[in-house]
From Swiss-Prot:
Residues 74-93 bind DNA. Activates ribosomal RNA transcription. Plays a direct role in upstream activation of rRNA promoters. The keyword Transcription applies. This is DNA-binding protein Fis. The gene is fis. Homodimer. GO terms for molecular function: sequence-specific DNA binding. Belongs to the transcriptional regulatory Fis family.
Length: 93
């Protein structure tokens, strides 16, 4: 089970282990671990466009959750994300 919270402008991920203990760590740690796993699976193969791959993996869930949180209000969502509303509209297409 994962849960995201904002604490002092740092996104954290809460996880529940097998003993039902909740632990929190910064989202960046989860991203770092996911990248370590990704590199381990590559077995030395070259990668192209890793930056774009990571952004695409993060951007869509971000857009989905912000739009859900703002109940579809694109102006409010754009303000929350710190981007222009037109830019948000393009990303939502």
């Amino acid at each position: 089970m994962f849960e995201q919270r904002v604490n002092s402008d740092v996104l954290t991920v809460s996880t529940v282990n097998s003993q039902d203990q909740v632990t929190q760590k910064p989202l960046r740690d989860s991203v770092k671990q996911a990248l370590k796993n990704y590199f381990a699976q590559l077995n030395g193969q070259d990668v192209n466009d890793l930056y774009e791959l990571v952004l695409a993996e993060v951007e869509q869930p971000l857009l989905d959750m912000v739009m859900q949180y703002t109940r579809g209000n694109q102006t409010r969502a754009a303000l929350m994300m710190g981007i222009n509303r037109g830019t948000l509209r393009k990303k939502l297409k």
